[in-house]
Each structure stands twice: as C-alpha cells, then as structure tokens.
From Swiss-Prot:
This is Nuclear polyadenylated RNA-binding protein 3. The keyword Membrane does not apply. The lineage of its organism: Eukaryota, Fungi, Dikarya, Ascomycota, Saccharomycotina. Residues 575-590, 757-769 have a biased composition (Pro residues). Residues 37-73, 101-139, 149-158 have a biased composition (Acidic residues). Residues 22-34, 260-276, 593-614, 651-661, 717-738, 770-785 have a biased composition (Low complexity). It comes from Saccharomyces cerevisiae (strain ATCC 204508 / S288c). It is found in: Nucleus, Nucleoplasm.
C-alpha cells in the first residue's frame, strides 16, 4: 500500500480506458466468484464473511488512491489552467464511471449475500483460488497505472517549463518599457530645469547666513499671510519679495561678478513688469530699494491690491485738512501731463510705491502730489524721470511753493480736485511762465495770448456737482470757450470780475449754493466805454440763452438798436418791454440791455426784493447797468463796492457800470429823500447801530445840524466819505464817460483800488465853474433844515425795530 500511495502522489489521473478495464475485470471476478459460490454450497459462513471483508478493504484502497490522484490534479491545475480544465473533465468522467462501478458492486454484493444464504455448502478451495486470481489481477492493474502516471508527469513538467519561459519574457518586456518611461521622464525634468532655472549648481558659493537672514526677515514681516499678497500672480509675488528684501541693507541681494549674467536674467524673468530693455539689469539704487510696492504697469488694468490702496487713499483724503503739519519740500510737481485722459487713479498707481500720498491735484497739463516726507519726493523724481508715462517723459520737480495745498473734499471725477477747469484748447508750450503756480492770486493759469468768452466762478458754499453741470451746459449749449474757477479764501471776486471785463470777456457767471446762477454781461458803448447788464438768481438754461443771444449779436457785426429789440416779442414768450422816452437810435444809457431775454419790466421789479445784492429796484427811465439813486452796501458774495449814481436829467453814456466812479458832481436837485430810500440805506446796518441812530434822532430832532450828524454816522458804518454821502442825499451826481473807471472795493475789511475796466482815455479836469457849483451845493445842503429827513428816518427805524 505504501508503494501504491507513493506512486499515486507522482502519477497523474489514470486514463478513462484503464479505469474502465479495471472495473470490468473486477466485475468479471465478481461474476466468477458468484458462480463459484453458487457451485460450492457447502462452504462455511465464516469464510464468506472473511472474503467480504477483504473485498471491502480493496475497494476502500482503490477509493483512497483515486482521492489522492484527484488532489494531485487540483494542485497541478492551479499552475496550468489549460491542463486543469482537461483533467477536470477526465475526473468527472472517471467519477461517473466509478459511481457506476460502485453501484454494480453493491448490486453484486447483495446478490452474493443472497447466494450465500442459499448456498451454504461452498468449498474453501474455490475461495483460495479466487483470492489468488484477484491478487494477480490487482498487481497487473497497479503496474499499468504506474506507467501511465509517469508519462503524465513528464507532460506536466514540459508544460510548466513553457509557462515559466513565457512569464520571464513578459517580465522582461514590462521592465524594458518601464525603464524607457523613466528615462523619458528624467529627460523632461532635466530639460524643464534647464529652461526655467539657470542658477549655478555650485553650492559652495551660497551665503547661508544671508539666506537665513532673508528667510527670517520674510517670516517676521508676515508678508506671505497677507490676502493682498496671496491674490497676486506668481511673477508679482517674486518681484514683491525681491523688492522687500532689497529694501533692507542686511537682506539685500549681492551678485558675484562671475554670476552677474545668470542672476540678472533670472531676476529679469521674475520681474517681467520692468521696462528696461537691457539684458543686464543695473544694480538697484537706494530709491528703488526703498520702494514699498513694485512699479505699476498702466497698460494693464488695476489690480485688486492697487484698488484697495487707492480706496484707502480716497477715504483718508477727506480727513486731511490744512491744519496738518506738512513738512517742507514734500510736494511734487508733475509737468508735461496730457490734457485729457489723466486721472488721480493713474497718478496714484505711478507714485504710490515711493511713499504715502496725502493729496493729488490735477491742473491743466500739470499736477501736484503731496507726500508726507521729502524723501519720497526725491525718490519719485530719481526713478520716474527717465520712465515713459502716458507716452512721454514727465517733468518732475520739487514744488517751490511753500504754501499749504488746498485740499479737496471728495472725488467728483477727473480733475475735480483742481481749482480750474477749462474747455479751451491751449498747448502746454505756449503758456505763461507762472502757469505752474497753483497759489497765485486767481488760483488758475492765466494766458496772455488767449481770452475766453465766459468765466464761471463757483462759490465755496456751492455744490460742485451742480457747478460741473453748469459748465457742461455752457460748453455744449453755447460752443463758447469757457473757464470755470472754484473760489478760494485768498481770491478776490471783485478783482476777478474786473479783470474779466478788462480782458474782453463777454460775461461772468456766479454759481450760488441755491442751484441758480447770477450773470453779468459786458459790452461796449457807442463811445467805446464798457457797460454791463446783471441778471440775478436765474437758471442755467436761461444763462445759456443770454450768451447765445450775445453770440448771435456779435456775429452779426452791426450796431444793435436796443430800443427796437424791446418792441420785439421775446423768444421765451415774455411781453415786450416798455419803451422809455428818448432818442430811438444808438444804445441810450437809460435803457435796459435785455437782448431778448425774458426779464420782467422795471415797473414790476420795483415791487420785488432785489435778491442778495442789496440794490434798490431801478426806476422806469434807468438802465439795468445804471446806478441806484443812493449808495448801497452792494454784496456780490464778499465783494462790496460803493459808486455814486448818475444824474437823471442829462443823458450821458454810462461808464463801467457800478465799478466806475463818476467825475465831480453836478448841482443837485433839492428834492429830499423819501422813506423808501432811507429804509434801503439803513437796512444793512447792524442792530446796535440802528438803536444808536434812533436815540440820537430823538435827542437832536430840533437841532439844525441833526441830519449832518446822522448822515456822518451812517457814512462811518458804510465806509464812505461824508462829502460823498451828502452829495448822494442831495440828489444825483453826473458821470463822465471819458474818465477812467476808478473803483473803491471793500473785501474782507480791506480797501483795494481796482484797475480800470477800460483803456484809459485822455480827459480834462472839471472847470472852476463846476467846482464853485459843488461848493455852493455843499453849503446849501448844510444849511437845509433836516426836519423832513429826520422824521422819515425815525419812521424807518421804527419799522425796522418792529
């Protein structure tokens, strides 16, 4: 049994033919045995039982052998799938046949038992012979099975060798492919490293101390954690880090001589926004190292980080006042700016890397930037003087002005922070030498070669948005060259208006805080004198219509019959103006110069208050540019002037309106002033002065010189001479149109003599006869009783106190 088991471990499953033969032999033996048993009926029962036991043992041994063979086949089938499939089919067939043999054996055993029960007389000799035959047959079968198993083992070994060879070849192919992929990846990596980095691979020249300082400086600055830095592109991050390291002398990069070419190319690739076309980057200057941020590229849109800094600047600009302690030489002058398309945002992007900007002013073709220290101004001049901005090189200088800048409140658009806006196109090179000074008397650039048609003055209390709207309406509605000036405390409105009329400006517009405008238009009289018309508290559209009418009349280039114009229907649907008595040709001095503008007749204006100017309504025979019958405290903003009125009896051409003083007065009429005139004279006096006048009038009502004392007190409060006041109380004084227009202005408590509004003309002094008449007038007026005037004054004061 041991030999059979050993052979069964090595050999394969026997072929189906052999198994069938063995089963057939067993069946034959069983048949023979059954036949012999049938013959020998006399055999004892013990022998039969022994035979049965031996047969059962043989069957069990065969089953064990078959089981071992099946296990061997399963193990071999795992190594070779194809062989396993064929062997499994053979095993199934063998098991089916074996099952059939077992069934046959069982049937035979049952038959034998029946035969044994029937035939008890079988012989022992027959049993021994059968056993010998069975042993011989079993030996034959075992020898045949061992031979077939050896053959199957050799076939399986050959198959194993073939499969191993195939596996080795597959492994070799996969290893070769992997090696090729690795080589290609290494080549790509080395190629990318060579393209991107050209730094020297010699690590012996690395300054580890400097590297540690740089790393520590970057980590201590907390720059990497800032959200503004994290949103930057990779190139801008590198440039920002380099700029920060170079700003400190301890962490600045030092380039060895033999590595300068490589390092400069690397830094040039990191700072792609640099404008240098040279391959070699020059060493950084101290000003460049002090830059807080990389230089902006105006060809690209504003970044988020720049937008945040500009928003912070606008927020802080509103809080800056003139009381700040601004160091000297911290104001940068910028010249050669384009006339258009320059904004505060552009200048902020260019100059903010050099220091903290407090304020930006943009004028016409130049501007100013206020830093908080003079070093920032010097750095900006050093770095930006050679750079191209707006397609040209800017003129950068330290501003020579020592005055504090005028700070604007709010950003109202391009150039809104300046004091001057113009629609005229004036080249940068043809301006006067003082055009850069933003602190001159007028606060705007004065050109000696060019005069505009209209000047717009904006009060400090006026709305800038409305002022810009008025400017746009004049520019688009009239087509005239217009300048708009934002008034400042140092500006004298009267001087500005006087200069405008003297320079030939057609008219001026004053923008009020009540969203309306006041207009004064200038024109030449028949003898070359300058006259003016005044319109108070009108809309911007009406002001545009006035200037359009002036434009049309000037384009016609012919004398205008203003009396005839008053008969025509007004273009705005107003009724025709009344025609006063007098000649119908030429510009009479007593007529209103409305030029088709829809103004109510003078009779209607007498019943209306005269606005903020403190002037009495004109009479029916008095032109709009004529003087009032008595001197008034006329307020045009802060501008005040006092001018004697013309005589009503004599038609003399008007001079410079209320800006022109008259010649020696003519003999006045003896008509006393009425109550309305006295009320107009004292309506602007302070309350304490009114009380003093009332008490003095009550005490000195019976004295003959009461009027003179009261008039003297009024003169002292109005800043006029007593002699001039007495002449005005007595009547109208004449004006000489040929005399130059002297003017007495009172602005901020200072008496300033304005320049003449028209070119001076030759004139003769008044004859002695007129001087004698003047002296007689003064004496008669001093001797005149003051009862009626004092009583009227008392009534007027009583009304004012009510």
């Amino acid at each position: 049994m041991s030999d059979e088991n050993h052979n069964s471990d090595v050999q394969d499953i026997p072929s189906p033919e052999l198994s069938v033969d063995s089963n057939s032999n067993e069946n034959e033996l069983m048949n023979n045995s059954s036949a012999d048993d049938g013959i020998e009926f006399d055999a004892p029962e013990e022998e039969r039982e022994a035979e049965r036991e031996e047969e059962n043992e043989e069957q069990h041994e065969l089953e064990d052998v078959n089981d071992e063979e099946e296990e061997d086949k399963e193990e071999k089938g795992e190594e070779n799938g194809e062989v396993i499939n064929t062997e499994e089919e053979e095993e199934e067939e063998h098991q089916q046949k074996g099952g059939n043999d077992d069934d046959d054996d069982d049937n035979e055993e049952e038959e034998e038992e029946e035969e044994d029960d029937d035939d008890d007389d079988d012989d022992d000799d027959d049993d021994e012979e059968e056993e010998e035959e069975e042993e011989e047959e079993g030996n034959d079968n075992s020898s045949v099975g061992s031979d077939s198993a050896a053959e199957d083992g050799e076939d399986e070994e050959d198959k194993k060798d073939k499969t191993k060879d195939k596996e080795v070849e597959l492994r070799r192919e996969t290893l070769e492919k992997e090696q090729k992929d690795v080589d290609e990846a290494i080549k790509k990596i080395t190629r990318e490293e060579n393209d991107n980095t050209h730094f020297p691979t010699n690590m012996e020249n690395v300054n580890y101390d400097l590297l540690q300082k740089q790393v520590k400086y970057i980590m201590d600055s907390n720059m990497l954690n800032l959200p503004q830095f994290q949103h930057l592109p990779q190139e801008e991050k590198m440039s920002a880090i380099l700029a920060m390291l170079n700003s400190n002398s301890d962490t600045a990069l030092s380039v060895p001589p033999h590595d300068s070419t490589i390092s400069t190319t690397a830094s040039a690739s990191a700072t792609s926004g640099a404008r240098s076309n040279d391959q070699r980057k020059p060493p950084l200057s101290d000003a460049q190292r002090r830059m807080r941020f990389p230089r902006a590229d105006l060809s690209k849109p504003i970044t988020e980080e720049e937008h945040d800094r500009y928003a912070a600047y606008l927020h802080g600009e509103n809080k800056i006042t003139e009381m700040h302690n601004i160091p000297p030489k911290s104001r940068l002058f910028i010249g050669n700016l384009p006339l258009k398309n320059v904004s505060k945002e552009d200048l902020f992007r260019i100059f903010s890397p050099y220091g903290h900007i407090m304020q930006i002013n943009i004028k016409n073709a130049f501007g100013f930037i206020q830093f908080d220290n003079p070093q920032s101004v010097r750095d900006a001049i050093e770095c930006e003087s050679q750079e191209m901005n707006f397609g040209k090189k800017l003129i950068l200088e330290v501003s020579s002005s020592n005055a504090r800048p005028q700070f604007d409140h709010g950003d109202h658009g391009t150039n809104s922070s300046s004091t001057f806006i113009s629609s005229a196109k004036r080249p940068f090179q043809t301006e006067s030498g003082d055009m850069y000074n933003d602190d001159n008397g007028a606060g705007y650039k004065k050109s000696r070669r060019h005069t505009v048609s209209c000047n717009i003055f904006v009060k400090r209390t006026a709305d800038r948005t409305y002022a810009i709207e008025v400017f746009n309406r004049f520019r688009d509605g009239t087509g005239l060259e217009t300048d708009m000036i934002f008034l400042k405390p140092r500006m004298e409105l009267g001087k500005l208006i006087n200069d405008a009329a003297y320079n030939g400006v057609w008219g001026v517009v004053l923008v009020n805080k009540t969203h309306n405008v006041d207009v004064q238009t200038f024109y030449k009289g028949s003898q070359g004198e300058t006259k003016f018309d005044e319109y108070i508290s009108i809309s911007a559209d009406d002001a545009v219509a006035i200037f359009n009418n002036i434009k049309n009349n000037r384009n016609n280039s012919r004398p205008t019959d203003y009396r005839a114009m008053s008969h025509q229907q007004n273009i705005y649907g107003a009724p025709p103006l009344p025609v006063p008595n007098g000649p119908a040709v030429g510009p009479p001095p007593q007529t209103n110069y409305y030029q088709g503008y829809s103004m109510p007749p003078p009779q209607q204006q007498q019943q209306q208050p005269y606005g903020n100017y403190g002037m009495p309504p004109p009479s029916h025979d008095q032109g709009y540019g004529s003087q009032p019958p008595i001197p008034m405290n006329q307020s045009y903003g802060r501008y005040q002037t006092s001018i004697p009125p013309p005589p009503p009896q004599q038609q003399i051409p008007q001079g410079y309106g209320r800006y022109q003083a008259g010649p020696p007065p003519q003999p006045p009429s003896q008509t006393p002033m009425d109550q309305q005139q006295l009320l107009s004279a004292i309506q602007n006096l302070p309350p304490n002065v009114v009380s003093n006048l009332l008490s003095m009038a009550q005490q000195q009502q019976q004295q003959p010189h009461a009027q003179q004392q009261l008039v003297g007190l009024i003169q002292s409060m109005q800043g006029q001479a007593p002699q001039q006041q007495q002449q005005q109380l007595g009547g109208y004084s004449s004006m000489n149109s040929s005399s130059p227009p002297p003017m007495s202005t009172n602005y901020n408590g200072q008496n300033i003599s304005a320049k003449p509004s028209a070119p001076p003309m030759s004139h003769q002094p008044p004859p002695p006869q007129q001087q004698q008449q003047q002296q007689q007038q003064q004496q008669q007026q001093q001797q005149q009783p003051a009862g009626n005037n004092v009583q009227s004054l008392l009534d007027s004061l009583a009304k004012l106190q009510k």
